[in-house]
């Protein structure tokens, strides 16, 4: 069966709005594990043993580096039950694979271990998404198929997630269940939620496993993002500038899941770290007890932003388009508010949440209520609130405000009165929320506020503008009320802290950070944290590199038949790449 996606009006409307759960299974659908379905494995038994070997060594190495332990008296069965409850929200964390849902090839597992051994000493060159070998050809449809292990309803939901990726990027997907060779994605139900990262470099099929608990649009979009080349957000080389990993709170056998990627392997295309990414772990992922944080955000008000599995963030989409679609539109539009030229419609901009219009020049109108808009502030207080406050708002209502202070002023925002927005308290995660974007780039996900009790934070903008978003996806509630005003851009910051050490020695592969604080009572403008690329000189000298050599294959049958295989070997050789992915060499320096 061949099928090329076209844009269906109803599906587009559903997909563009939000990747939410759908209703219960259709009664006519057969069980997902229907008899007669061909059983598959994510990889061969021999390859699995190799990967398990290196993953075990990785966990032991991480445990040696971070030996902190917290002793608690808790029934192991209760701990297992807590994790089973967690799987409802983030089922991809419960898998047996690397970081829960990433299926590594043997050479990848070995390279990860070698990187961990030599961290900060030797550059180990590897071919992950930073290499074109694992990127799909955006000029051709990506072939996908089902192996028969999903019901018709489950297939429809999976295709809706693909349709969403299709609508927001230049990528096209084509179904072909009869294809038996070449690169293609095969959806199966073989082992929880799991996928490889990027295209198979040898032109073979790759499995994306989606068990019944994974059939949610947000989780499917997450796994498809892996197949298209995305790693987890908190694995970025620069993550320590945004979050702190609480090693002492991580389950003993899971510390290897929090290793960072080598800068050589990841091309972030200049897109900043994204707390709201659908690829980010939640706050308590892989914790040894359900009340312990394993990831703490550097700015505490971002804590409830991380870990969502509802929708692709604007920066998730922007990164995918930068990697695959940057050449689609011959000319770029003068997009505002962090927008960029839409590769699906080159005559319009793709806008961050809260903005619309050809150039993102308009504030998005309210949905399900008359609310939001652009408000020009003065020094007098202006109040904004959820629809109907203090009465309860309704499920599905959305409001967007752009608060603008006059020149020489910034925006001051503070919650007042009763506050209630639906959240998952155990997971420290907002389901419905008020989001405040106060940075210099409105493309970045902001701080999300939810749960019960009025947030005490007094928020000030980095510029004359601030965006406030009210989103009620799941249920009604009391909502919020806040006051905003323009305050003079007065008072100075305290001095910057010293720069942190650069995370890499050359090639523009590293970054560094410094911070500053605003004294109480001052209305400081600008950002409290600054990061920059560092050590941009070209890499020279010797690097640990992967080389292919012909040798005897492993396995009894291969030895018996005398089969020869191409094998990887790590050797010291002159560095192949002078610059990290996304940078080019110009006059001895690596520039973007």
Swiss-Prot record:
Span of domain Peptidase M12A: 127-326
Protein name listed in UniProt: Zinc metalloproteinase dpy-31
Known tissue expression: Expressed in hypodermis, rectal and vulval epithelial cells and amphid socket cells.
Residue ranges occupied by any EGF-like domain in the UniProt entry: 349-361
Signal peptide: 1-18
Glycosylation site list: 167, 438
Major location category of this protein: secreted
Residue positions of the active site: 223
Propeptide: 19-127
Lineage, uppermost ranks: Eukaryota, Metazoa, Ecdysozoa, Nematoda, Chromadorea
Domain CUB: 371-487
UniProt-annotated location(s): Secreted
Region annotated Disordered, chain positions: 22-46
Role according to the record: Metalloprotease which cleaves the carboxyl terminus of procollagens, such as sqt-3, to mature collagens. Involved in cuticular collagen maturation.
Keyword Transferase listed: no
InterPro entries linked: Astacin-like_dom, CUB_dom, EGF-like_dom, MetalloPept_cat_dom_sf, Metallopeptidase_nem, Peptidase_M12A, Peptidase_Metallo, Sperma_CUB_dom_sf
GO BP term, pick one: cuticle development involved in collagen and cuticulin-based cuticle molting cycle
Entry EC number(s): 3.4.24.-
